[in-house]
Amino acid sequence: MLVCDYIVKQIDGDYAHLQRTDAPEEELKVVARALLPAEIYEGCELHYELMQYEMK
């Protein structure tokens, strides 16, 4: 089970580009905004656990 934190690096229309805080060298993860909290903004932190994203 993956548990990690992300930073929203870019919002591009219906998608957000996320960077893992514990592995910044990894490729950015592209996630549909429909799966993310509505109040996200570039630079905010998200917590991922049990296939859900929450604002940190």
Describe the role of every protein-language-model region.
Residues 26-37:
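Beta-strand/loop nucleic-acid-binding surfaces
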